[in-house]
């Protein structure tokens, strides 16, 4: 009977995740049209911030308990998943006939690169995460949000839809459905795995690691179906930006100092794959199964390297 309840919970979570992601992307497009902003800006702000909420809660909670290791590990792991797993899903989910160079605002990728560089280089030089770093990152991310919203505008040719009523309400509710659905999927998947005797180490490095990226993955599939890869890359850059500039800053300011784990390798991987995502966003975007599967294999190899 217990397995039936868990499977029902898993199924409900999956439905909420998929339907919520569809509506979230649709609402993001409508919000972009209403405020005459490129879709990539909404992807970087509204969706990027929303899908970083789980990391914010988890890392802040860990920092409040004095566990900066867990908070930083969560951020680094999430950014690697965004730059490998989410990009892989995009290249696999795009329609076969889609091929175009996307119009992407340059603020979010440039500042993601800057904040990532500051974050990584500070640790490499000082071997710690000082309070000042957290304060600087927080100030920078606030400035970036202001720049993105105040300086970008959309061309008339991009105004393809009509404004719909209650788009903010729809967007907010769909985001909540996506986040709650992903949590239901992860919680029930973990419970099912434990029921069958799967170790906590395997569960943590697979189900939970991938589960934290489910909102981004679901949103990517929806955006790909709508032929909106600009939203996907906007979400990747925005999510990575918020993970470091907001989530990381908050965790560091709450619990600054050294961490006991050695994360130089993970930081290098995060830095490297973040710039790969920027490079790919500047080229013609089309369905590429080879690249998609290559990125998935790379992500799996990264997970195995953590053992």
Residue ranges of predicted features:
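Hydrophobic alpha-helical segments, chiefly the membrane-spanning helices
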Residues: 1-307
């Amino acid at each position: 009977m217990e397995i039936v309840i868990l499977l029902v919970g898993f199924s409900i979570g999956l439905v909420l995740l998929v339907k919520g992601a569809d509506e979230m992307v649709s609402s993001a497009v409508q919000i972009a049209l209403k405020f005459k902003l490129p879709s990539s800006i909404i992807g970087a702000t509204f969706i990027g911030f929303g899908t970083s909420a789980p990391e914010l809660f988890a890392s802040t909670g860990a920092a409040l308990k004095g566990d900066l290791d867990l908070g930083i590990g969560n951020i680094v792991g999430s950014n690697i998943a965004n730059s490998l797993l989410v990009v892989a899903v995009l290249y696999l989910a795009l329609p076969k006939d889609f091929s175009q160079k996307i119009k992407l605002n340059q603020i979010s990728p440039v500042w993601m690169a800057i904040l990532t560089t500051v974050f990584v280089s500070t640790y490499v030089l000082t071997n710690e995460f000082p309070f000042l770093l957290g304060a600087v990152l927080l100030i920078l991310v606030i400035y970036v949000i202001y720049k993105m919203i105040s300086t970008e505008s959309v061309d008339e040719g991009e105004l393809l839809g009509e404004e719909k009523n209650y788009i903010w309400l729809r967007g907010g509710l769909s985001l909540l459905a996506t986040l709650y659905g992903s949590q239901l999927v992860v919680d029930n998947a973990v419970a099912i795995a434990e029921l069958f005797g799967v170790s906590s180490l395997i569960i943590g490095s697979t189900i939970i690691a991938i589960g934290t990226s489910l909102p981004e993955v679901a949103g990517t599939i929806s955006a790909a179906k709508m032929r909106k890869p600009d939203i996907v890359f906007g979400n990747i850059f925005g999510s990575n930006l918020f993970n470091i500039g907001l989530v990381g800053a908050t965790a560091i300011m709450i619990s600054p100092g050294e961490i006991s784990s050695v994360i130089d390798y993970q930081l290098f991987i995060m830095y490297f794959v973040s710039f790969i995502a920027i490079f790919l966003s500047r080229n013609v975007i089309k369905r590429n199964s080879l690249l998609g599967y290559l990125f998935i294999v790379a992500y799996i190899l990264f997970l195995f390297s953590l053992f």
